[in-house]
């Protein structure tokens, strides 16, 4: 697909969703992300999936099954990029959700359960 860089997303709030098709807790978190995406779409907000699967087709299939329509990036084959992202965001497990502010700073990070994302977004967008 289209090339997308995190620097392209500057000026917006971004949720990075680190996940994989084989990760059951990751997949179970998608309905919650769909609600968040619907609520804040059109605001200064973007959701980006960062998946780690052997094949892009597997990610596409999982995204279709889970009805997620935000951009997905597969970092499995891109070892350097994967290592860089894992180090930059200190990813030790998935699912991990990271909320980044318009300046590119991490607001909050959730490993596993991301229920607290709602509170953070409500504070930001007053919704």
Segments predicted by a language model, with ranges:
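Active-site acidic short loop of glycosyltransferases
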Residues: 10-12, 42, 68, 91
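Thiol-/selenol-based redox modules, centered on thioredoxin-like
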Residues: 99-127
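Conserved redox-active cysteine motifs that mediate thiol-disulfide chemistry
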Residues: 10-11, 18-35
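Extracytoplasmic/secreted envelope proteins and their assembly/folding machinery
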Residues: 30, 34-37, 56-60, 86, ...
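Short beta-strand segments
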Residues: 17, 47-51, 74
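Short, internal strand/loop/helix patches
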Residues: 60-103
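A short beta-strand-turn-helix
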Residues: 1-14
């Amino acid at each position: 697909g289209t090339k997308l860089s995190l620097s392209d997303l500057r000026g917006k709030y971004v949720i990075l969703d680190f996940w994989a098709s084989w990760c059951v807790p990751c997949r179970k978190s998608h309905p919650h992300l769909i609600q968040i995406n619907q609520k804040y779409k059109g605001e200064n907000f973007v959701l980006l999936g960062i998946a780690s699967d052997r094949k892009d087709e597997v990610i596409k299939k999982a995204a279709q099954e889970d009805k997620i329509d935000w951009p997905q990036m597969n970092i499995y084959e891109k070892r350097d990029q994967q290592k860089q992202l894992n180090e930059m965001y200190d990813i030790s497990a998935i699912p991990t959700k990271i909320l980044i502010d318009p300046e590119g700073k991490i607001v909050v990070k959730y490993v596993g359960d991301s229920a607290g994302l709602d509170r953070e977004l409500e504070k930001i967008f007053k919704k």
